[in-house]
């Protein structure tokens, strides 16, 4: 089974935080997923956020014949490009964003993954893309791990039908 690992970010939040969570989530799912197709050869960050990368991501995921797409929202996410990729590929979709930290004393945030997930869900519904999600928890939380494993089992069933 091949999983398209498509971590996403947004420009107005911390790139460093997005890169940190991209790596941390990948380390956890590598132990679970049979085969991961990532974006490391698409751009220098290995993250989806630029409109210009959408055709390259779609082409790569088709060429690799992924069975599902996993979109971790590493700092917020870019709902428009996520929606375009998901709609083009028509495979099971999983959304997840790590639990957000408390805002700094000045009210600023490095990330707002939960809000990004709401925005992405709305765009996916607009594109008639069926999706599921894992609750905002830390990537090493058993809720994330069991949710990811359940998604893989569903993908296996869909693949055999």
Locations of regions flagged by a protein language model:
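An N-terminal assembly and electron-transfer interface module characteristic of large anaerobic redox
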Residues: 1-161
């Amino acid at each position: 089974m091949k999983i398209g690992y498509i971590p996403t970010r947004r420009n107005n939040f911390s790139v460093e935080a997005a890169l940190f969570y991209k790596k941390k989530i990948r380390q956890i799912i590598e132990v679970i997923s049979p085969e991961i197709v990532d974006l490391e050869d698409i751009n220098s960050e290995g993250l989806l956020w630029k409109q210009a990368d959408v055709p390259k991501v779609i082409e790569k995921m088709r060429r690799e014949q992924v069975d599902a797409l996993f979109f971790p929202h590493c700092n917020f996410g870019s709902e428009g490009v996520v929606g375009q990729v998901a709609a083009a590929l028509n495979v099971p979709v999983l959304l997840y964003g790590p639990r957000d930290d408390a805002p700094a004393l000045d009210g600023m945030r490095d990330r707002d993954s939960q809000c990004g997930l709401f925005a992405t869900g709305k765009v996916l519904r607009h594109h008639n893309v069926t999706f599921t999600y894992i609750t905002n928890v830390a990537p090493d939380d058993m809720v994330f791990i069991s949710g990811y494993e359940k998604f893989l089992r569903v993908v296996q069933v869909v693949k055999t039908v």
